[in-house]
Amino acid sequence: RYMEQVSRIQRPHSVVHENDFVPAFPLASALGPDGRVYTPADREHYAVNVFRPDGTLEKVITRPDFETWHRDKRDMRRITALFESWAGQNPATWPRFDLKDTERAIAALHIDGQGRLWVQHSRSNRDVPDGVFLAFDLYDSDGVWQREVRFACEGNPVSDGVRFLRDGRVLLIKG
């Protein structure tokens, strides 16, 4: 077992905690061609656990200068609307939502055909020039930071995503 999170959700509940419904590691894990497993260490920090195929922790890749994106009013409306849609159609039965004031530090992890790690983080779609879809941090196969790579293509970074194919291509997934 590489990582585990136990969430106890009791119904009826008066409080729903964001971390119970949206844990970081299942949403942003990647499997390398050599069997290594890459997962965020937690929700709040830019730290990627790298596990060997036998489950032992090999290393943690960090970016100490990284500051997680703090949600503004628009971000809070978006995440609140998402939780309200999960809660059902009757607002009278909704619990209170315990939502974080930051986005997840690491939004997605990808491993390309060369074994390089691409990190999509909470700032990947923020403060980027017009025409840039997402910015990624690129690490070599040893976990050494190489550079920021910006993807210039059509797309909505909130609703669209990418998948890295083993042959070097990147697939844009709309919607």
Located regions from the model:
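Eukaryotic scaffold repeat domains enriched in small/polar residues
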Residues: 1-175
